[in-house]
């Protein structure tokens, strides 16, 4: 049974996903259906967590919009996500950045990982 599930999900995995992790700033191009037409909506922010593996992997992106923190969780291999762009790599020492929820302004900044920026 497990081999069957692995075989089915392997076909669904996307290969165009860039390498990113918590602390990186990403721009997600999400497909949004409004009525009878579909458009692309951009969501740019800091990845605060990645969860799971395989077809069920997800990641959460946080941004500040009009002074209010907005977090959105996306499935990693979803066809509703048109493209993921990595804007900059952040240097953090945690896998889950929940502490950013309590920080405001300049305190919520993340240092850039210069070693990854040149690759």
Swiss-Prot record:
Q: What Gene Ontology cellular component terms go with this record?
A: cytosolic large ribosomal subunit
Renumbered to this chain, the signal peptide range is none
Q: Which InterPro entries match?
A: Ribosomal_bL19, Ribosomal_bL19_CS, Ribosomal_bL19_sf, Translation_prot_SH3-like_sf
| SUPFAM superfamilies reported for this sequence | Translation proteins SH3-like domain
Q: Which domain of life is it from?
A: Bacteria
List keywords of the entry alphabetically. Answer: Ribonucleoprotein, Ribosomal protein
Instruction: Give the GO molecular function terms.
Output: structural constituent of ribosome
GO terms under biological process? translation
The UniProt similarity line reads: Belongs to the bacterial ribosomal protein bL19 family.
Q: What is this protein called?
A: Large ribosomal subunit protein bL19
> Which gene is the coding source of this polypeptide chain?
rplS
């Amino acid at each position: 049974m497990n081999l069957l599930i692995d075989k089915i999900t392997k076909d669904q995995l996307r290969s165009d996903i860039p390498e990113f992790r918590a602390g990186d700033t990403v721009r997600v191009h999400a497909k949004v259906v409004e009525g009878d037409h579909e458009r692309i909506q951009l969501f740019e922010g800091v990845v605060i967590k990645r969860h799971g593996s395989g077809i069920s992997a997800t990641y959460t992106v946080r941004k500040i919009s009009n002074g209010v923190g907005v977090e959105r969780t996306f499935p990693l291999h979803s066809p509703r996500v048109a493209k993921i762009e990595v804007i900059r790599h952040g240097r953090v020492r945690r896998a889950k950045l929940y502490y950013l929820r309590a920080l405001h302004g300049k305190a919520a900044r993340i240092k850039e990982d210069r070693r990854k920026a040149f690759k």
